[in-house]
Amino acid sequence: MNWRGLLLLLLALPLVARGQQFVGCRVDDGWAETPMVRQVVALEAVGDGRTVWVEVASLGYHELYVNGMRVGDRVLQPAVSQLDKRALRVAYDVTPYVRQGRNEVLLWLGQGWGRVYGRPAAVEAVVYSRLETPAGAEVELLCRSDSTWQASPSPYAYTGSWQPLQFGGERYDARVKPQWRPAATYEAEDVVVSPQEFAGNRIVDTLLPQSMDRLPDSSLLLDFGRVVTGWLSVAFSPTTREVVTMEYLDHREAVPPHTETDIFIPDSGCNYQFQNRFHAHAFRYVRIKGACRLQAKALQIGAVDPTSGATFACSDARLNAIHDMVKYTLSCLTFSGYMVDCPHLERMGYGGDGNSSTNTLQTLWDVRDTYRQWMQAWHDALRPDGDLPYAAPAFRTGGGPYWQGFIVKAPWRSYVNYGDSSLIFLYYDDMKRWLEYIERQSVDGIVQPWKDTERHAWFLADWLAPEGVDIGGESVLHATSCFVAECLLDMERMARMTGHDADAALFAARRQRVVAAIHRHFYHPESHTYANGTVLDQCYALLLNVMDDSVTAAQVEAQLLRDIHGKYRDHIAAGLMGVPVFTEWCIRERRSDLMATILRQPDYPGYLCMTKDEFGKLNFEGADAMGPKFTTWESWDCGRPGKEDRSRVHNCYNGVGVWFYQALAGIRPDPAQPGYRHFFVDPQPCEGVNWVRASKPTPYGDIRVELRDGSLKVFVPEGSSATLLPGSERERTVGPGEWTVRME
């Protein structure tokens, strides 16, 4: 192999950063937070069939400019990673930006998550050209980051600590001018550099203010009509002389620490414009002080376009509003290679929130690249003894085994929903190690609470259930043990897939022991309840069939329904963990009338409470020309007198979203032929729903279903097959094409 081939091999494979040159900018008090680094690259010729590439691995965010032009449309690059262990490399084809002779390559950096890990804003960059020939690719190294580069501070700086509820914002000081100096090198021998799996964030929408009101304190309040995750871009009047503050609110009454603030410091002769660069906010409102006149727009950032993906509509405007709210919320929460709890206050990749809504998210969009990136962070967070944090990248947070078990559920669900087994093969040993850790924490088959550590706090099961639902005590151990049993079932399947038959037998036997222990420890025959008898407790036991016989199952179900109708008044009675479990039970047991009744409740606790307008009136007309107007909340209690206020764009309750597709539209995957290579279409009748129309993207194309006047029309994409109305007299299996059958 010649040196060019060797270089190509090195560029194509993950690099260990030992001996590599990360460069940044030193200032008097340490490292600049948002520096610029640059180098001039000479090209003897262009347009000879060669392509020119820049590969960038930054400890924090970066933007790439070549000859003054920004390269690409991706923002907040790279994705998140476990920065004490891994930096992500992004490759840019800069051929359209270069010219013969001198070319300036400039990287603008932002420390970002490096603030948490004690990493400076530093970057490793490689510039090379590549020519494809019949004999293979020829690669020529043109430049690599080192101390010959130049660096300068920039006008941007951070105002917060990058800790939960303390993220702050950005300060742009127009008085700061470039002061170029030799770049400082930073050794990161403990960091692995590997290619980014995630495709990158894009600006998916641009919004103008729907209103701009002058408040009594002379500040301006901008209302963009809906919550967005992203940036503010604003042009101030040239007469602006004061320091301008921009405070971001996800609802009108939000106050610190539930708000974040950017700062603009003008200078004579500056362009009087501000736009976020290495920070993002979640906001509907912006309160601006210090500016008399301005023009503003909100730039919505995400991994998915909220107008793309799966679609659903039915004859009930209330159900449509909830579906649209859940879908739009998830588009606000999915970015940078993970799905967060909330995009502004914590920004954590919680496994519990992920488990709660993965089936919904993967039903709505193709987010395989997000899960590949996110699972890499879970791998990096895993300790040799199998212990995991509750979020990845790792951060000390609250949660429990349901949060950690994302490492098992995400690969299995990605396989079922996309037919992609790569995560199973890549992380099988990690999943097995975590389950061994859980077994060591168990007594008589029941996992026991552990002490708080520097990695995680608390030992939770359900979280933020409505007032009056007892989610403590036995319920924590019961629901957690049910989840472990579910993970063991998934692991048994994955072990057989990967040829680990002996492991599969062990997982199956262990699951039987856990299920028997659940019934033995938590069933109360006198009340026909498990643990505390919550909706989560009862539904999980029924889903896993932990009871001894069908009579007991019928008694447990009857008690569950009595409590839902009586104690809970046909209202939702579950939290983060309970919502997806209850949803799955309703789908399996064809309880669409029950779910619809609960979803239609206009008062606390319920989803429609989240669709109230600024005057407190319900507004469930769904999306308009502006898109969905509402997002789901962190707590059912948001806005209630005397209750702690929380995030108004959150991932606690989005697990219900799959119900619209699997129950009302009836589109269900077949784990035996995953990725919707074969699927079922079995719409469930629901009182008050006269028609349903839905589409679902799959690796084979879109599935389309329409149900109207007792007639079911189904489009099956090429390469797929579907079983229509399984278990009924009209059951039939069909191939690609459009099919119509009568429901009755």
Residue ranges and their predicted role:
Residues 1-20:
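Bacterial Sec-dependent N-terminal signal peptides
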Residues 20-339, 343, 369-372, 389-393, ...:
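Extracellular/oxidizing-compartment recognition motifs
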Residues 52-53, 230-248, 275-276, 286, ...:
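Alpha-helical support elements that line or immediately flank enzyme active sites
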Residues 61, 126, 144, 296-325, ...:
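Active-site acid/base region of carbohydrate-active enzymes
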Residues 73-78, 82, 252-259, 368-466, ...:
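Helix-terminus loop motifs that line ligand-binding clefts
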Residues 109-128, 567-610:
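Repeat-solenoid scaffold signature
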Residues 124, 128, 150-172, 187, ...:
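Non-catalytic C-terminal accessory modules of carbohydrate-active enzymes
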Residues 343-354, 390-406, 448-477, 524-546, ...:
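Carbohydrate-binding/catalytic loop surfaces
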